[in-house]
Structures are given as structure tokens and as C-alpha cells.
Amino acid sequence: KRTYYPVPDNKRMIVAVEKDSEQPIVLAGLHMKHPATPFAQKGQTAYVRDGYIENLITAMLSERLTALKQINPSPVLSASARTGSFLVAQTKEAFSLSFGCKEDNIRGSFRAVIGETERARRFGFTATELQRAKADALQRAQTRFAERNERSNRTLAMQAVRHFLSSEPLLTPEDRLALTKRFDAEVSLKEVNEAARKLISNENQVLTVLAPQKAGFTLPSNQELEQYVLQAQADNSYQPYKEEPLPTTLIEHAPKAGTIVSEQPYGHFGVTKLVLSNGIEVYVKPTNFAADQITMRLWGEGGLSLCPETDAPNFSFLPNAIVDGGVGAFSADRLDKMLAGKHVRVSPYVGQETQGISGQSNRKDLATMFQLAYLYFTAPRTDTTAFATSIDRRRAMLRNRNANPQVEYNDSLSLIAYGHNERTAPMTLERLNKVNYQRIMQLYRERFADATGFKMLLVGNVNIDSLRPLLCQYVASLPAAGRKESFANNLPEVRNVNETHVFTKKMNTPSALVTIIYTFDLPYTPKSNLALDALRRVLTIAFTDSIREEKGGAYGVGVQGELDCNSR
């Protein structure tokens, strides 16, 4: 017989604080408890509908909380909202806020997150916010429906486990999509805002705080932390949320289209090769492994190998500083809003030997994927405020970074393996002070100034007839002035030495970590790379069986292996 332990209600806030010398930042959680839905009611449509509304509320609030990180200086390191079980209890559910605080302004972090939540409770959400949240919910249901035949065994098993243990309804993707469409039409802004006022109750509250324990840092008392919450909830200065209207298109003026110079079969695997007027080679491989998914990669040689070593501190912010700044006329926040309801992800990257843009979309949003790729290539947006807040957050994280023994171990391992090479050195406060935003933007623009020699690979459920005009409009139009580049042979390699390094660090829970690195000379071929992967898998199984299972000598054993296809 399963025993369900009751969780009592409380009038006064419960404050629970824990300090740990290995905790890097101050993490706070505010939970507003309410009765759990009885198991017998979870099979009703009303339960699924309530869950749909709660998901809309937390999605809209989390969007607002994420925007707090764009303020300079940012009042928080991170923030999000959720609903569900209260910690591990089955008899209580809760609306929960989770946020990382600034050590030097914990009160300000509390006020920012709880204040934004209180503003939503008092004044509700806007029609445009609800429209975006509904669009995202519908898009997710449509994606699950399209991929219903590709669900993993684990996904099906976990759904059965949740049904058995918690009476969660067993809904098929068809059921979920039909209900989402129905709720999309039924649920009004008034209903959502009324539900938000009930969910964000400011009652039956529990505050949890996990903080570093270190010299020079004093956490406010439990009473002070409680007052931070109550004062933020009682503040009368909040105003209704407002936002500027969004444009209707990502690109105001479409670029001048290029052309397709040639098109022909390539190899023996159903690949089509197209050469565009700017020289970019495009390889298209139609597949039906996923019902509605197209993956794209656009890349050229060069990467960080062509950037001077003196810029190594800036490398850590490529491409995050670009993504944080947005593209074209859109800040990162407004770009996310613009993409509501679309199944598309696009991100630039600058690796050691290549730079490029990767993306994924469904067939409906294929044009959006190409538009974003074009913008990241030609119109990265400078946003000094977003970068300053990013630096501020990174600095706050670095102050206590070495409190975690695993982090210090990994840093030491990297420094030893690569001989303290600047290009692989971990980020520190000293290195952070050398980071220059203008130089980061300059490096990025240099890497994407010329598309000569770039290649594109498209794999998925793609129709080449609908693909051609998009290639002409957004890929053949990329600038190509004839600059031919390859990567430089200056990348750090693991030292070929026979050394043993032992170091100790005081830990709350003592444990030992052992890493053994082997290097060997082996020419890269697809066959040898596959053989190495097979060896890695076999050794992982063998070591786990012998070292962990039979001898109980380790928590776990991992084996990694890699061949460098560009090694010279």
C-alpha cells in the first residue's frame, strides 16, 4: 500500500535556508501551495483544460522574467515560473518561482522577480502575450502529432509510469492536438487572468534559499528574507505591463535574389548538389526519418584558428554575444516574440576550424529558417546593454565558480592537457576583464564577411521544388567577394607526454576523480572513426560491469574517444 503524507497549510511563510561551501550562487524558490487535484478527477477534460491554462500562465510569466536579464544592470542571474507538485509531495501542488540572486543585491533580486509576478497577478496579461503563448502551445502539439510515429520507448514508458503512479491521463498525440485546438478557441484572456489571480495566491507560502558559505559573504536573516517577499508583494507602485507592437516581417526589404548555376545528382545516396551564383555549394538529402523536420548547416573554413591568440578571452562570447544582441531590427527578446508559434531554431557558431549557421525547422517555417540564417550572416545586431548584462551575470557566476570541486578539477585537467594554452584556458575574472564587445563583433563580422567557399547541407522532409526559390533569395544573395580561406594549423593539441598529476581539495562529501588521457597517431577515415566509436562503447560496457558492478569500485566509468579529421 502506498502512503501519501499530508502537507499542512501555513498562514505565516515558512523560510528554509541551507548554506554550502560548494554552492556557487544564491538560489531562491518561492512556493505558493494549494490542494493537489484528486486522482479520480485527472481523467476528466477539465483537468487537462486547467493544465493548459496554467501552462499559458507560466509561459507568459517566464517570458517576462527572462526579460529581466536584459536590464542593465540585471537584477537577477536567472528566473522562471512553474506549476506542479510541491517539491516531492503528492498531496500538495504549488505555483513556484525559481531565481538566482545577485549576491550584492539580494533584496533587489527578490523585488524584481516577485514584483513582476505581482504585477501579473494584479493587472493580468495582455492579449498579445496570450496570443503568443497559445501559438507556442499549438505548435508544440502539432509537432508531437507530426512525430507521433517516432516516439522513443522511453517516452511511452514514462507516460505509462506517470499514469500508474499519479493517474495522469494517457493522451495520444491525436488527443492532445484535438484538445489543444479546442482550448485555443475556448479559453479567453479574462479566464486566464482570473486563473492567474487564484494561482498566484500570495498565501500558504514556502521560501527556500540555498546560498554559498564563504568568508566575506553574509546572507540576510530568515526574517529579512521573509520581509523581502512580503514587501515586494505589498508594493503599490506597479503599473500594467506594456510592450511595443511587433513588425509583420523579419526582413523589411528582401535581398536581391541570386540564381542556381547548376543542379545534378551527387554520389550514391540520393543527394542533389546545387551550385549557386555566389559559389555556395548546397547538398540536399531528402529523408523521411522525421515526418516534418528539416535540418540545415551552412559552414565555411577558418573559425577561431584565423583569430589571433590575444583575442582568446573574447572567444568565450562567440556566438553567445551575437545571439544575445539579436539580428536586424530585433533585439533577442523581440525576436523570440516574433517567432512565437513557429517551429524553427537558428544559431550561428564560430568553432576552432569552421564558422557557420545551423538550424532546424518544419516545412511550414522553412522560409523563416532561411531568413534568420541570412540575418545572422549579414546583419548581427549590436546591443551594448544586452552584452553588459551578460558580462554582469558571468562575473557574478565566476566569483564563486571554484567553490565546486568538479569545476576546479575540469579547469586543471584542461590546463594540464593543453599545456596552459591561451586558446583553451578557462574563463576567470582576470580574463573577463579583457573581454571587449566591439572586438567580438569585429571578429564575428570578419568570419562572416565573405561566403566564398561556404557549403550548405539540408537533410530532412524537404521538397526541392519549394526549396529552390528560398536558396536563390536568401543563400545565393549572401556576399561573396572571392576570399578563399582555410583553417590555420595553430590549434592546441593534447600534449604527448607521460605524466601523473595529483591534487587534493577539501570536499563536503569526499570522493576521488581519475582521468587517464591517451594520445595516438592514426589517420582519419570514416572507417577508423566508426571503429573508435565501437571501441568506446565496448570499453564503457566492460568497465562498468567490472569496476562498478562487480567490484563496486566507482560511482561510474566513462570512456571518450575522438579522431581529428583535420589533424596535420
Identify the meaning behind each predicted range.
Residues K1-N72, Q131-A135, Q142, R162-P308, ...:
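Proteolytic maturation boundary segments
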Residues P24-T45, L65-E186, N204-P212, Y283-K285, ...:
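M16 family metallopeptidases and their MPP-like homologs
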Residues F448-A449:
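Flexible, low-complexity linker/tail segments at the boundary of structured domains
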Residues L539-F543:
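Short Ser/Thr-interspersed hydrophobic loop/turn segments at strand-loop and sheet-helix junctions
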